[in-house]
């Protein structure tokens, strides 16, 4: 959906989706007998176990659906990723609770009784990995060796996908324009400042508080000064108790928030559609690079092949076709490995 002491390290993880090359001929390298074997898709740990990429795609298409959770379209370009996956492989993508937190993703795995709605995969902050113990399926994507050891579980139960830098974003109608976090304690911002979620449940909000602590002379390890700052903003009426996201911004519920830079980019595009303008800056009093969000497969995924194909897709994009480039019937004409190669740009 963390290791707090590492938040200030500048991990070199791409801010959208890790872009690693996927070998287009992957399926053809598998033994001819592999595809003929009966496969338990819930325990498949690699494309080789699946009998090759063509076999994995075929089974995923047979399942026909993929259940995502907490993946809003304006977050890390998920909208385009979902559209491309659905169109390329003709798999229906269901997105539940798009604005949910990492903690809520784990709760959904633990408590969802209706298997049709059970999440197949999760995108969670490292801060909740302990809560996910025993819930995730080991699976190593084809590009496993290219993922830094520091951002993956050795057994393949999770792997870092993308990370961002903490930004301060705001409606351009705000005056004066904020340039640092401590600027937010200004009477001009009454009723304007929001956090991007609950810091006890959402990694983005947690690190926003850490950044605020740093800006006020504290540290990421001890966020007391960050908490005190937001208490002060609440007392003077600047802080509003709404989630700092695109939908609440559109209603005018707030005008200033902290959040990942890649989300600020997405919010900027969304705001333009409703006639508003957003700008973002990296606050001069807190330069904070986040550790990655990790992707993982639910051990009890109702669509286990589709879940594994999604992970292969997410770790394989380069500069190939996206949704607008794909013909509606491409998936009927092209086998799985070749389709993946087209998405990659091969």
For each predicted feature, which ranges?
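Short secondary-structure boundary segments
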Residues: 126, 197, 261-262, 326
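Short beta-strand->loop
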Residues: 136-145, 156-160, 185, 269-289, ...
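Short, low-complexity disordered leader/linker segments with a strong preference
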Residues: 1-63
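Mature extracytoplasmic/periplasmic domains
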Residues: 288-289, 293-346
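Small-molecule pocket liners
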Residues: 164-167, 210, 278, 291-295
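Extracytoplasmic ligand-binding site segments that recognize negatively charged/polar headgroups
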Residues: 67-83, 94-110, 116-253
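A ligand-binding cleft/hinge motif common to bilobed small-molecule-binding domains
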Residues: 127-133, 250, 255-276
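Short, polar/charged alpha-helical segment
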Residues: 50-61, 71-92
